[in-house]
From Swiss-Prot:
PANTHER family: ATP-DEPENDENT PROTEASE SUBUNIT HSLV, METALLOPROTEASE TLDD. This is ATP-dependent protease subunit HslV. Na(+) binds at residues 158, 161, 164. The active site is at residue 2. SUPFAM superfamilies: N-terminal nucleophile aminohydrolases (Ntn hydrolases) (SSF56235). One of its GO terms (molecular function) is threonine-type endopeptidase activity. Belongs to the peptidase T1B family. HslV subfamily. PROSITE patterns: PROTEASOME_BETA_2. The gene is hslV. It catalyses: ATP-dependent cleavage of peptide bonds with broad specificity. It is found in: Cytoplasm.
């Protein structure tokens, strides 16, 4: 798996992820790019789960964004509907965190769309709970920027989770 975390603070949203690709107990690659910009750089997206499945979902989500003029929630709900009803999509094993300047969402592998708690922190993947806990503690107890919180949360997850490394890709809006 992996770790993807998103923090929204002081007018910025940051999504970051590690670069480890594992096959069973073997590390296959350490520098995968699991966080990307979509829709002309206006949407951030990060994935956890099967790499090929995630790229399929990135493509489908970007099509939904184009179809709905970049409306994040509408695009996510439409993707989730397709994910639940299409036989081929139902077999995809991945989760996405998506964010624009206004909102952040998780799109789950069973076709659910989840909005964050009031703290605007989201995390997915095998190290997601570690990163989420770290990010919440840092938001509540420091004045760090959203980017610094994402970096530190990923570092903590990478130190604890064997399926997460410390080779990070981090994107932020506004840029």
């Amino acid at each position: 798996m992996t770790t993807i975390v998103s923090v929204r603070r002081n007018g910025q949203v940051v999504v970051g992820g590690d670069g480890q690709v594992s096959l069973g107990n073997t590390v296959m690659k350490g520098n995968a790019r699991k966080v990307r910009r979509l829709y002309n750089g206006k949407v951030l997206a990060g994935f956890a789960g099967g790499t090929a499945d995630a790229f399929t979902l990135f493509e489908l989500f970007e099509r939904k964004l184009e179809m709905h003029q970049g409306h994040l929630l509408k695009s996510a709900v439409e993707l989730a509907k397709d994910w639940r009803t299409d036989r081929a999509l139902r077999k995809l094993e991945a989760m996405l965190i998506v964010a624009d300047e206004k909102e952040s969402l998780i799109i789950t592998g069973i076709g659910d769309v989840v909005q964050p708690e009031e703290d605007q922190i989201l995390a997915i993947g095998s190290g997601g709970n570690y990163a989420l806990s770290a990010a919440r503690a840092l938001v509540e107890n420091t004045e760090l920027s959203a980017r610094e919180i994402v970096e530190k949360s990923l570092k903590i997850a990478g130190d604890v989770c064997v399926f997460t490394n410390t080779n990070f890709t981090i994107e932020e809006l506004p840029n």
